[in-house]
């Protein structure tokens, strides 16, 4: 029997962010982007900061995840996110300013500096948040 939909639950430390029936999702795993469809083999993996693309029957939704854990069962997908943010909750000016400041800091550093990786991650997070803002403007 072919399964056409499954339940997705996205939960952060603070609250439930999304709960509903979906057709598929795309999320950034530690090995790259994962496409998860109903009936997928069981999976437990870490997720990296990036976009969660949710495809429902009649609409799509996008969230920013700062990382977390993805559990997949054939009929239920659960994401335990460190932080999950909807586009409407992001301040585009703040995100752009944060990205610009981080880029200025990193230009003054050398690759061996302790904070180089931390600031690189901040830039990656800002880029993902800006992608989310752009996707929801369309």
Curated annotation (Swiss-Prot):
UniProt keyword terms in alphabetical order: ATP synthesis, Cell inner membrane, Cell membrane, CF(1), Hydrogen ion transport, Ion transport, Membrane, Transport
Compartment(s): Cell inner membrane
A molecular function (GO) term: ATP binding
UniProt-listed PANTHER family: ATP SYNTHASE DELTA/EPSILON CHAIN, ATP SYNTHASE EPSILON CHAIN, CHLOROPLASTIC
Subunit structure: F-type ATPases have 2 components, CF(1) - the catalytic core - and CF(0) - the membrane proton channel. CF(1) has five subunits: alpha(3), beta(3), gamma(1), delta(1), epsilon(1). CF(0) has three main subunits: a, b and c.
Gene field: atpC
NCBIfam families found in the cross-reference section: ATP_synt_epsi (TIGR01216), PRK00571.1-4 (NF001847)
Family matches, as InterPro entries: ATP_F1_dsu/esu_C_sf, ATP_synth_F1_dsu/esu, ATP_synth_F1_dsu/esu_N, ATP_synth_F1_esu_C, ATPsynth_dsu/esu_N
TM region(s), chain numbering: none
Biological role stated in the UniProt entry: Produces ATP from ADP in the presence of a proton gradient across the membrane.
UniProt name for this protein: ATP synthase epsilon chain
Membrane topology type: Peripheral membrane protein
CC annotations in GO: plasma membrane; proton-transporting ATP synthase complex
Keyword Nuclease annotated: no
Pfam families recorded: ATP-synt_DE (PF00401), ATP-synt_DE_N (PF02823)
């Amino acid at each position: 029997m072919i399964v056409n939909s499954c339940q997705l639950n996205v939960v952060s430390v603070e609250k439930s962010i999304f709960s509903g029936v979906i057709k598929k999702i795309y999320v950034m795993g530690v090995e790259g982007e994962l496409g998860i469809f109903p009936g997928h083999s069981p999976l437990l993996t870490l997720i990296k900061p990036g976009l969660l693309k949710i495809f429902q029957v009649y609409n799509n939704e996008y969230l920013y995840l700062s990382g977390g854990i993805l559990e997949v069962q054939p009929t239920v997908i659960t994401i335990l996110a460190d932080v999950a943010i909807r586009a409407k909750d992001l301040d585009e000016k703040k995100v752009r300013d944060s990205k610009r400041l981080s880029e200025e800091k990193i230009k003054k550093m050398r690759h061996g500096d302790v904070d180089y990786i931390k600031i690189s991650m901040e830039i990656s997070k800002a880029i993902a948040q800006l992608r989310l803002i752009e996707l929801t403007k369309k």
